[in-house]
Amino acid sequence: MNPDLRRERDAASFDAEKLTYILDGGSERTRRRREIENLILNDPDFKHEDLNFLTRSERYEIAVRKSATMVKKMRDFGIADPEEIMWFKKPQLINFVEPVGLTYSMFIPTLLDQGTTAQQQKWLPPTQGLQIIGTYAQTEMGHGTHLRGLETTATYDPKTQEFILNSPTVTSIKWWPGGLGKTSNHAIVLAQLYTKGECYGLHAFIVPIREMGTHKPFPGIIVGDIGPKFGYDEMDNGYLKMDNYRIPRENMLMKYAQVKPDGTYVKPLSNKLTYGTMVFVRSFLVGEAARSLSKACTIAIRYSLIRHQSEIRPGDPEPQILDFQTQQYKLFPLLATAYAFQFVGAYMKETYHRINVDINQGNLNELPELHALTAGLKAFTSWTTNSGIEACRMACGGHGYSHCSGLPNIYVTFTPTCTFEGENTVMMLQTARFLMKSYDQVHSGKLVGGMVSYLNDLPSQRIQPQQVAAWPAMVDINNPDSLTEAYKHRAARLVEAAARNLQAEMKHRKSKEIAWNFTSVDLVRASEAHCHYVVVKLFSGNLSKIDDKPIQAVLTNLCLLYALYGISQNSGDFLQGGILTESQLTQVNQRVKELLTLIRPESAALVDAFDFQDVSLGSVLGRYDGNIYENMFEWAKKSPLNKSEVHESYHKHLKPLQSKL
């Protein structure tokens, strides 16, 4: 054990193990998670070479082998609960890339969400047994986030009671679905439904794409891998082109919308029910953002505790680089953000499951807010995490650029989250639509609930000159609840400003849609402010649920740092709204620096509490034992270029060149 890390852990004021229990939702859940993780971590069947030294084809083959082995092991161990399946997979799937993964993350959830009881009875058993390997084919070459623009067609033929699927243009080719290229034999395809000469919009269809047994594509199916990407080397993201490909009528998922044998269309209770899988995945991605940022912070903070560099005072020993205030300022706000997102992820998972029960009982009242919240928070957390991982990499100096740090892999694996399941700017604009509708409701005298209930107070919140001096005295920068109120007022102000700007644009634009485009920057800002408020509110609200006083004290400091750092980065909003004065902003900046000092001795234990095993962290710099330099040297020696003392290129190219000089 590195002596610096041992000393840092001993100096913490709280028990990291107890904080792990809080993050997991209880000590029993921690025990069970570790029990399941150890089943795979101690299994020799999952040992393999460092993926960094393998070709893409080799990486894909290993990922498929591991996936197949995992399925067998899960059957042997009787692991069937969705959360326990995730616990089992994550230690070996570094950064969560798995060719068969969409079978569990999208294919089965869509079947459960949109399939009838009969369809579930038919398709679930072979899918759970992995005779059916599924993917989710929504995105096309020419359209992604704009779902209504998707071009793939499914035309009903009442004579044969079949749907005829076509990719009518090159831009309609399905593009990007994970596992589609070489792994999957079935896909849930989203296509424009045509029956009796009418188009009824997007619907989901189960489409067999490869023959069972031979795995060859069926006639009418052209399918393959889209080629190398920025990351995700183990994943065979694919393309799918269909030419007059027929499937039975029963392959349309018909829990909500239906097509009768004669072609009669029965519409669903709500068109948004079709988007249930996306809402599920977006709520899941908030938790993944927390996990990825927590990993990056763990690596960067442990490295910063081990790395000694430069001098603070001439002649003194080289300090740990985490003793530099600038390094703390880079990393501790991100650490606070990682904890904030942990609580937001837990809230989103709980909220999705609660509202999904209501939806299955026909109660759609909370669906609009769930859709808006998952869209906005998916964008907010993934944008923040994406830039945060890169900040952690740069905080590790030159070594952060090496794959041995694990940070490049975390980054390239996470960064597509900003564009898949909805491009983030468009997601923010979807949230903005809900905010504008809620604002209009309040403006017309109705009350709104949920996370937008702060809009009910808008008439009394409109800042008048005499109120500006009175309001700031109410903000206590050492009180998370008071800071939550400040964020609430900021969100309300920016939502109202966007609504007024939209109304002003509508007066001299040709249509509401054009006015919307000319207000879109303001609308995105309003959505960001709303999401920022939600995160502060949820972080602050969880503090009172913590009984352990030392842990509560440390998390309170993290919550304060998260909120105050956010104010310092968006100071104009708080000044313009009359929420804070200039002198208070000076106090905010000073308090941020004080909090860095308070968090410094707790930092090792705070990242230990995330409880990442070295295998799942995949980093030499972030090793639990801190022995980074010895292992960095051993890692480098494994490079394929080092297999021979003299590389063959010397004899082929350099030696002949030198002989002619």
From Swiss-Prot:
Modified residues (N6-acetyllysine): 216, 255, 267, 272, 437, 446, 512, 637, 652
Domain of life: Eukaryota
Keywords of this entry: Acetylation, FAD, Fatty acid metabolism, Flavoprotein, Lipid metabolism, Oxidoreductase, Peroxisome, Phosphoprotein
GO biological process: fatty acid catabolic process; fatty acid oxidation; generation of precursor metabolites and energy; hydrogen peroxide biosynthetic process; lipid homeostasis; lipid metabolic process; prostaglandin metabolic process; very long-chain fatty acid beta-oxidation
Listed EC numbers: 1.3.3.6
Pfam families linked to this entry: ACOX, ACOX_C_alpha1, Acyl-CoA_dh_M, Acyl-CoA_ox_N
GO (cellular component) term, any one: peroxisome
GO terms of molecular function: acyl-CoA oxidase activity; FAD binding; fatty acid binding; palmitoyl-CoA oxidase activity; protein homodimerization activity
Family, as annotated: Belongs to the acyl-CoA oxidase family.
PANTHER family: ELECTRON TRANSPORT OXIDOREDUCTASE, PEROXISOMAL ACYL-COENZYME A OXIDASE 1
Protein name from the UniProt record: Peroxisomal acyl-coenzyme A oxidase 1
